[in-house]
Amino acid sequence: MDKAALRKAVTEKLKRLTEDEKHEIEKKMTDVLVRSEVWKEAKMIGITLANGFEWDTQAIIETGWRQGKSICVPKCDPKMMRLNFYRFTDYDQLEVVYYNLREPKPQASERVEIGQMDLLIVPGIVFDREGFRIGFGGGYYDRFLEGQTIQTVSLAHSMQIVDKVPTEPFDVPVDRLVSEKGMVVCKKG
């Protein structure tokens, strides 16, 4: 299957989960993540605010705050097709923008560079065990991560993990997958 077909097939599976099923999976993935060494060692974490059928990241964000971690969320720049991350400490620092996305208000948040973050939780829809992913099709994270060494993880239910994701030269794999069954260290190449 090509990327578009895989994205569509897995999105449909995710949308069929009941709220209770989804919540139970999110609790398990959050537990796996926050017990991991990569989480424990991180002081500043980049994470996406969930929208629609995506895995809800609120429990992860709030766990980070309780543990004294700095939490950063992205703001998309659609003209430049890039991401800028901002540290936020309260949901009042967010605004609703296009596609009903919640993003930081730049005037109410501190912008951070990728090198300041210790861990980035990268969103996606389909993944393989080498860490390659199919996101939402904009390439924002691949551009953001190009040439960077930041630790990366993605939240991925086992139904989202396939044998092989079709790749292109600009695709940047993640280091680890966090599923409801545990942490998968990706084998790149």
Q: Predicted segments — roles?
A:
Residues 1-115:
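N-terminal active-site beta-alpha-beta segment that forms phosphate/nucleotide-binding
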Residues 79-189:
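Conserved phosphate- and dinucleotide-binding cores of soluble alpha/beta proteins
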